[in-house]
Amino acid sequence: NSLRVDYLSNVKLEDSTPRFDELRAELDRMQSKMWGVSVKRNKWGNDHLEHVEFTIKIEDNEEYIVRRLEREKRIGTVEKLDEHTYRFSADVYDTSEMIPWIRTFICRIDKMNFSNRTIENQFKKDLEAMYRMYGIRQEVPQ
């Protein structure tokens, strides 16, 4: 069950839960896979992770893009593939939470691979629509 904090109108302070340390440890473990607040679990309560991977290309004088990628990523890794190519990859609970951030690398993304194909396909359709709308002749990343 989820509850929006902005809908709460009355809060009463009571004793702390005896499970606080256990719950805090569980949150700490889960945060290494959380981009935002969403957590997906299967019907047995086990974590359901999605893999996100994209490759960007930079020019000679664009190291600041790599620094930005490293600085802004909340989780995951950045791997240098060659002088101009870098790969970001992460296992997350919800790929869709990352899309606004990934969009900021449009026109630099060379390849992408999301285990959640629905999100990947929607991202590509959105790019195609944007390219058509602005008359940009660029291929959508594969």
Put a short name on every predicted segment:
Residues 1-55:
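Core beta-strand-centered patch of the WYL/Sm-like small regulatory domain
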Residues 32-142:
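Polybasic (Lys/Arg-rich)
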